[in-house]
Amino acid sequence: LIRNNDIESFSPERLPAVTRFPMPPEMSAPGRTLTLVCTKEYVYAASGGDLYRLNRETGQYVLFASVGGGSCVIRDVMECNGSVYVLTLMDGLYECDGNGRIGRYFRLPLEYEKSAGAKELHLDSQGIIWVATQSGLLLLEPLTASTQLLRSDLHYPYSLPNNSVWSIFPDPDGGIWVGTYGGKLAYMTFADNGVDYFKATPGGLNHPIVSCFEEDDAGNLWIGTEGGGLNYWDRKNDR
């Protein structure tokens, strides 16, 4: 986690011990948005449009790549097929090689003639990258660089419930949970092109804005909302 301009790391087995990695002044300068992303291989720390890799043995931050303009904000980072994908809030998606050199750039969908805000990345079991944006769900095939934008369509029952996608979470049954801003919770299964909706109801989902998910060891789904607190879905009893 990031706290007081430091990255802090701890293990539940070794509490209350906390390891701190102080950020250099250029990373924590006023006005720069800080983002922390942990992959299987690296710990990434973003400051504005600058992306650093943290060496956990030495505590040093090494500049990996710089993307976007002066007001750029990095939202998420993903490693796929030897490439590193860097998602920004408003400046698009960048593909870098293992050394941080930018190779390809993918523009985000437009909303009201401006680039739509982006939220996060997800890599599915078929190798497709899902990009959550506030103007739809962008699907990217890394090998061919082809993209497809999924948007809400009132005339098509299996479309997204809302174009503003805030969160994506894989389900162990093979589907994908998609949280939207005010447009219900969606469960997508591309095997049968199905989309199930879960709207805010008494005794069910208590708020339509879903911002994050997490799954516990028993397979139950914890659903974080913007204004409705934390929801819990009992998978075994389907409630």
Predicted regions mapped to residue ranges:
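Carboxylate-rich, polar loop motifs that coordinate divalent cations or form catalytic acidic clusters
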Residues: 1-239
